[in-house]
Amino acid sequence: PQCASALDEPAKRAISIKRTLDTVNEISHAFLLPALLRGRVGEFSISALESELEGIQEKIDAIAFELYEISEDDQNAIKLGNKEESSLDSSIEADEEADADDLEEESGDNTSDQGNLLSWCVGVGFGRFDLRLATLERSAPPEPDPFDPLPAKSPGMLPDGAAPFHVHEGILVDDQGHPHDLARLVEEVLARVDVAVPEDVRRWLQRDFFPFHLQRYSKSRRKA
């Protein structure tokens, strides 16, 4: 019982870290803001979080070995198996990254922090994401408990009933000077969050955005 209770806090912290890492992933139920803006709603360092998570995993393993009275030989065998599995996962991940690199060659640096920021700006323009988190006009909601039901919307999305950044009929256009010109809206969003506006926003939208969006929102990034 003492060992079992000792697992409570590290397990909860591990879940919290994994969720925090997902707060910059716009297709996650935990999404808040893109990486370039995430620090505005709380301290955020991917390397520090991943390092802490690795330490927690080692602590949980040690407690589990003691709890189930795993011999030292079996512990070594388990650790070896975990390393082999990790190596296989890394190989699969490398293949997926190679596929993503192919897409990047076709559509620019789509997985960069800037690409993610511009994608978020597009979402703000369409009324999907909430600009107010980045301007601190709205506070981030508290972290849910591990077994709470998944929300219908991520906390970074515009709440029901809230006014969107730009009122439109569901269609935005690529037409300089048009009141619903998407490139202009993206530039306005960047200005509102005090981020320098790139010179090539319209070009990025014309050439890079759709391949990026398809890659991000497809179930698999692999190409036949």
Where in this protein do the model-derived segments appear?
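Extended amphipathic alpha-helical segments enriched in small hydrophobics
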Residues: 1-64
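Terminal accessory regions of large proteins
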Residues: 62-65, 73-224
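Active-site-proximal loop/hinge segments that shape catalytic or ion-binding/gating pockets
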Residues: 68
